[in-house]
């Protein structure tokens, strides 16, 4: 690893270290009464003139400027001397800020010279802190080996092939099967006939071979159709004899159908649905009630019937 030397950073760190030393080496102030503190407001932080006399590197801002600004705000606007003082104050404040900046820069320069003297080596100017001549060498990248991703590519291809495909239609299967059969037949013929051909025989033209093949296919188709037509259903029996026997059976069964159908009829009356109940008629109800009822009820009922009939008439 190469380390770069940054003088500015070192100067800043040295400056902070000096400030910390000053903070810890200061003597604690003596205990004073509150009256003395009130009478001496600027003695705690120090006035501007005292700080200017003392050559400290760090110059804090004096609170006297703030007190002057507060006093100017409190004064009424009608007073002329206050207006004059307000005009002169901004310039004095700007001069003080410029002076404090100059003093800080001088203190930083002093601290940098102290560091240079302690190291014993002369540092280059700040412009040459990062030399452009040194460039990083990236030649080691070419020496590295590239990862072999062929196995991953093969896995991806296999996963694509294993995906579920839609089933082929019946017509496509037939057409493909015929193509494969034709290819195999051509290869078998070419492989089996070339060994037994006689070179002295005359070769037939292509048209004659095609016509011979067409005639063979037509003959085979005709033979298959004739054989399918001539195949009997019951071998060893004539069609005419079978037809005559079937006609006789139909004629004998046609007049005997009603007689044969009668014994199969059930004498029981057809009932409705198995879940339905048939209510008894009114006459049956009256007969049952007459059988169970006493004599005086029977007489009353007979009288009611007679009166009912008379009213209807």
UniProtKB/Swiss-Prot annotation:
Composition-biased stretches (Polar residues): 62-77, 105-120
Listed Basic and acidic residues bias regions: 95-104, 198-207, 283-313
Positions of region (Disordered): 29-136, 188-313
SMART domains: Tankyrase_bdg_C
Pfam families: Tankyrase_bdg_C
Biased composition (Low complexity): 80-93
InterPro entries attached to this UniProt entry: Tankyrase-bd_C, TNKS1BP1-like
Protein name, UniProt field: Uncharacterized protein KIAA1671 homolog
Organism: Gallus gallus (Chicken)
């Amino acid at each position: 690893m190469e380390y770069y030397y940054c003088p500015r950073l070192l100067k800043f760190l040295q400056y902070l270290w000096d400030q910390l030393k000053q903070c810890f080496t200061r003597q604690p102030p003596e205990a004073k009464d509150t009256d003395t503190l009130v009478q001496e407001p600027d003695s705690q932080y120090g006035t501007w003139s005292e700080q200017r006399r003392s050559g400290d590197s760090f110059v804090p801002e004096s609170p006297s400027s703030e007190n002057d600004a507060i006093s100017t705000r409190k004064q009424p606007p009608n007073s002329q001397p206050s207006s004059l003082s307000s005009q002169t104050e901004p310039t004095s404040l700007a001069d003080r800020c410029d002076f404090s900046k100059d003093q800080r820069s001088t203190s930083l320069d002093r601290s940098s010279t102290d560091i240079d003297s302690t190291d014993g080596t002369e540092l280059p100017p700040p412009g040459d802190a990062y030399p452009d001549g040194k460039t990083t060498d990236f030649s080691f990248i070419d020496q590295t080996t590239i990862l072999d991703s062929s196995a991953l590519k093969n896995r991806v291809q296999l996963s694509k092939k294993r995906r579920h495909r839609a089933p082929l239609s019946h017509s496509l299967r037939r057409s493909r099967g015929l193509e494969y059969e034709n290819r195999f037949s051509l290869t078998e013929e070419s492989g089996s006939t070339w060994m037994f051909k006689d070179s002295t025989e005359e070769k037939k033209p292509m048209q004659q071979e095609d016509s011979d093949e067409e005639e063979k296919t037509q003959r085979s188709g005709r033979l298959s159709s004739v054989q399918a037509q001539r195949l009997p259903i019951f071998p060893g029996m004539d069609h005419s004899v079978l037809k005559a026997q079937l006609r006789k059976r139909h004629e004998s069964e046609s007049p005997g159908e009603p007689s044969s159908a009668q014994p199969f009829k059930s004498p029981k009356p057809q009932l409705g649905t198995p879940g339905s109940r048939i209510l008894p008629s009114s006459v049956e109800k009256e007969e049952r009630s007459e059988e169970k009822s006493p004599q005086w009820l029977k007489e009353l009922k007979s009288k009611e019937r007679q009166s009912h009939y008379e009213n209807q008439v």
